[in-house]
Amino acid sequence: RQMCIRDSDNTKHWEMKNTLALATLEGFSKWAKAGLKAFVSYDLRHFELPDTEGGVMKYNEHSVSVGGQLSKRQGKLLHYNAVAEIGVAGEDAGTLAVDGDVDVNIPFLGDTLSVIGSGFFHRITPSFYFRNYHGRHFWWENDLDKIIHTRIMGTLKFAKTKTMLRVAVDEIKNYAYLSQSYNVTDNNQAAHTGVTVQAKQSGSPVNLLTAQLFQDVRWGILNWENVITYQHSSKTDVIPVPALNVYSNLYLKFPVVKVLNIDLGADVRYFTSYEAPDYSPALSQYTVQDNGDKNVKVGNYPIVNVYANVHIKHTRFFVMMTHVNKGSGDKNYFFVPHYPLNGSVFRFGVSWNFFN
């Protein structure tokens, strides 16, 4: 493999994009029932990477694309938005991005039920640094295929009960990702040798199912905010996700006098154990673990914080003790393998708004 002889890694990047658009606004006349836009864009991306002789390799990528948008945002019952853009010349020739969403608001049992459908189809060029990277520790030049990402998502939202249910299905073909492997000594999990990071592309499609429930409850001064997420990946060695992720925030919110309000509460974050993405200090990027049976699982450990907020007009004082349950259970307080979270930390501060 090629090696960089510089004493440090560096890269430069700048981008210039120009877009010319013509649009008719929704409602500007009695015939304009929706907004309509057509546009053409020119994109110039410049990159610099070190070469093997101490010099610099320069890359320029040009791209021309055309697209259009149809949208309706006025009114109470029905709204929609659709955007399409296709690459017609340059590095992104043959790319396609189609995004759309539609929502219907229906009166339901004294509440308003919002039914929202959204989705997209993206055929995109992998990022430059997945295709080209030169450094002292890692070096690659890849010829990667276009990434094809499809998503279909549906959302149900109740305004009064503050309930929202969201379900999404993703399929990603030719998914590009970073993979990290190293040698681990049996007596020291933190000692790594032979570290290798590679940019890879999945040969088969990856399917991802996501279901989320958002529920806020308020009863007098008692408030309870919850987010529960379920996910399933068809290829956990490419896109690892926890099966269950929970966030819950329980607090009391009450006034003391007219201009003084106090919040007292605690929140908790929890996710089931899984082979979480590793971290590469040499790249400052997260990577998929690729160490076989020596992959490390994290999770199955709650993180609990307690806090108090004092609001006086436009000023807020707060105190917080994070990770108050440090040392409990199996002490597996990691979000990333080999990088433990902080123990209990006391924080305090003040913030204010500069408006009347």
Language-model regions, residue ranges each:
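Exposed, low-structure sequence patches enriched in small/polar residues
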Residues: 1, 5-356
